[in-house]
Each structure stands twice: as structure tokens, then as C-alpha cells.
Amino acid sequence: MYQNHKNEILLATPLIKDDIVFTKSVVYLCQNDRHGAMGLIINKPLADTLKDVFEELHIPHTNTFKEILEYPLYMGGPISPHKIMILHTTNGRNYTSTIKLDEGLAITASIDILEDIANNILPEYFLPVVGYSCWTANQLTDEIKSNDWIVTNKLNKKILFNHENKVKWQNHLEHAGYTLQSLDTLFNRNTGNC
């Protein structure tokens, strides 16, 4: 039976292994309905930074805060890997291409938000991602039933937007009430250093 998980977090379980994209992934679900789901992986930083994006798009950034220039881009998923989007808290600004989500979040795919960021006009929280993840109708439901994903509706913006990516999966897991030991028990095998 279909269940809407929009605005929830997917945590890859140890059953997803040897998958370069989804192993130990934390996915924020932006959209989920009977036709499918769309989400962004939020814990897989790439080598490219916002400075690289500003230079490629010829966005002036001489006055941009250094820490903003060093923000990594995140691999949002395998679909459209060259499309940049900003997952962010709403800040009262109206951008050309914004989809408002729940919990005061939005996703914007237009250059005007990048220009604002380059000018240090920042949302409270934001995460630049390239690409996205997609599931067809019933695909995500089937993967959840197969225990590939733990779903949590315990959204915490500080954890969601935190740049400590090596522990983001575990932090979300713990925030959802799980431990590495409980995963061992749940999956009846040793997950090692998940």
C-alpha cells in the first residue's frame, strides 16, 4: 500500500552495499506521490565547491565570504548530474525557479539564488546539490518493504544541513532512535563499522 514519505529522511540500511551512489546515503525526500518519488542525497560531498560554480557561471564572487566559497557541492543523485539545485530554508526571497517544500524548506534551481549566495545574501541553512534521485511508482515502497531504507520523519535542520558528512548518516540514524548495535540486531548480522 502506498504511503507518502514527502519531507522525510531515507537512511540506507546495510542491505544496500557496494553501491557507489546509495551505500550509507542520507536522502531528503522532496516529493513523493503515487507516481513516484524525488529526493536529494545530502551526505555525499564532491570535490567541486561553490567557488567552482561561480567561476563556471561567471558569477562575481570577489566579496563572497571565504567559507561560502569553500562549501562543497553534494551529489544529490545519479539523475541530471550537471544540474545544480540549492536545498534551503525559505528566507522571504522570491527566486525564479523555487519549489516550496514542507517545514520551511525549498529547493531552487535558478541562477538568482546563486547570485544571492555570492553576494552573501544567505538563507539560514542551505546545501548546494548536483543531480537528484528518483523512484518510479511503487519502486520506493518496494525498496522500503525490502528493508533497503529506514524512513524517519524526525527532520532536524541542524543535522540535515550539517557539513560533517562522515557522521551524518550515523547522526540521522541516532536521531531516528537507532544505534549501530540495533541495526546489527535488526538485520541479524554484524554491520561492522557502518
Swiss-Prot record:
GO annotations of cellular component type: cytosol
Short name of one Pfam family: DUF179
Listed InterPro entries: AlgH-like (IPR003774)
Family label: Belongs to the UPF0301 (AlgH) family.
Protein's recorded name: UPF0301 protein FTM_0963
Source organism (scientific name): Francisella tularensis subsp. mediasiatica (strain FSC147)
